[in-house]
Amino acid sequence: VQDRHDAVVYLSRGDTVCFDRRTQPAASEVPVDYSALSVSRIVSFCREAPMESLARPAEAAVRNWALCEEGLQGRYGMQVGRTLMQGGAPLLGDGFAMEVIRVACAGVDARMAGAPLPAMSNSGSGNQGLTCTAPVVAAGRLLERPQDEIVRAVAVANLMTILVKTQSGPDEGRMSPACCAAFAAGGAACGIGFLRGDGADCLERVMQTVLGNVCGLICDGAKANCAAKVGMALHGALQA
């Protein structure tokens, strides 16, 4: 592995070299200019853009929701979502926030346990895509919002997540010691706020509050307990 965590340059099996790219210079990346991203521009775009330009968020809403439903129905991983659905109500309540949290946790349960369904990613991570998308879809359904409004809110959630990731630098955004569910949970909170009619100033404060709440969450590797971390991050996000 050279230069990047996903840049495999040498592979062998026994005495057989499958490929060797160690002598080749690393491909130079064209830097992406994120300076156009701001909270106000994100909100304006997602509110005014024609629906055909929001095809990706629309697909994310459908695909990630299907994965969450699979997680609620099957026995995947730690079954965080199913546990919250079946036994969380007496202690934690059974209202809006719990429904939003358990749906997202179920999606991560299913993904981390290898469910044969795709997840639409955010910033290269399926768990981040689930975390910033599924809660918004769940909230939109609970609030009985039309599908086009839910898609616009999903776009807000994903773009706000990307905005925060760009502030931590290219290397930190790609592989961070922090659990990036915190960033994505903030995006989800912004998407839900957008559904409620909150403006750009409010959404910026929401994101700042979320990051202040859960910024100390550390990544200890991708595995089943990611679902529990997503649940904790979303709990802090919904408080914001």
Give the predicted meaning of each segment:
Residues N122, V136-L142, D148, R152-A153:
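Inter-domain interface/hinge segments
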Residues V1-G114:
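Signature of multi-pass transmembrane helix bundles
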